[in-house]
Amino acid sequence: MTFKRIDLSQYIVTSLCFTCNNSCTICMLSGVKQKMSGIDLDYFRRVIEEIRDSGRFENLILSGAEVTTFDDLDHYVQAAASLGCFKKIQIQTNGRRLRDKEYLRHLIDQGINEFFISIHGLGAVHDAITRVQGSFRETMAGLKNLEAFDVNVISNTVLTKTNCHEAAQPIRILSQEKISEIHIWNYFPMEREDTKDFVVSMKEFGRLLPELSGFARSAGKALVLKSFPECLSVGEPVFFDSLFPVTVLPDRFWREFSECGFGRCFYREKGECQNRECWGLSSAYLHKYGDEKDLLRPITPSQPSPLEGEGKGGG
């Protein structure tokens, strides 16, 4: 079976705003978004014209903190669509405003043809993560509205200790929706220690994988795992994918990101693992659970990445 996946190497992300109608406990921007400002339309036009002229990317992602809280979003979408160079224009969104079907229709009419929607659990679990009561209901209403349109929909769930105990159930439900692929992201702690107690151990994650894989296989959909150690791969329909699209964000964010110690690996640091794309473990993970050298394994030319048979680049 061929599993449909997008190729993120062909996407570039532009962040338009840093406002949000959720207050997620897991937000990577929570410590910096109040200090960052969005981009005006003239500057955005220059950015997307440079992207077009580079010829490097064929798809555009519009993001924010929550891009649908940006009142002028439709004008930015229209500007991007008018260039005629982007096959896909995606928004990354919590999906709550998409419950307004006319608002959704207007965005699609302006040029949005792909939606990346975050759903972090069922009911109260999702609402506890977003810290907005009723947000799960609104997001699912938005997801339901998308069924009426010829657009690509991808779901995203960030795995934390808050939702891992019931992670299988939302994945089961999402696998039955009009969604082309299901993403699960490993939680990125924007700190060197897990002070919030969100980081899930790879052993616990490994226990979840067979059930998650079963739901995806039954639905004929790809289950894409982002920023997990690639040596844990179990084969299709599960795809361990370390690739993230090029992302345009203020330097302040990248400075803080670089201080958090991502990409740690016992075997890579010893020179035994040759995989340079894998996200490995974070400093916060190492502090909490250790280096997992008995669980992980080096990927070398003689011991190739299990991803080679998975079509890692997508398509």
Q: Locations of the language-model features?
A:
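Conserved alpha-helical substructure of the radical SAM core
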Residues: 1-92, 98-113
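Flexible, acidic/Gly-rich N-terminal and inter-domain linker regions that tether
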Residues: 1-13, 22-26, 208-231, 288, ...
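Glycine-enriched alpha-helix->loop->beta-strand junction motifs that scaffold or abut catalytic
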Residues: 109-114, 177-181
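Radical SAM enzyme [4Fe-4S]-AdoMet core and its adjacent flexible, acidic
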Residues: 44, 132-144, 148-265
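Conserved radical SAM core fold
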Residues: 21, 67-69, 95-98, 115-132, ...
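Glycine-biased, low-complexity coil/linker segments
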Residues: 308-313
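Hydrophobic faces of well-ordered beta-strands that scaffold small-molecule active sites
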Residues: 10-14, 60-62, 89-91, 115-117, ...
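Flexible mid-to-C-terminal extensions adjoining Fe-S/redox cofactors in radical SAM and related proteins
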Residues: 2, 237-238, 242-304, 315
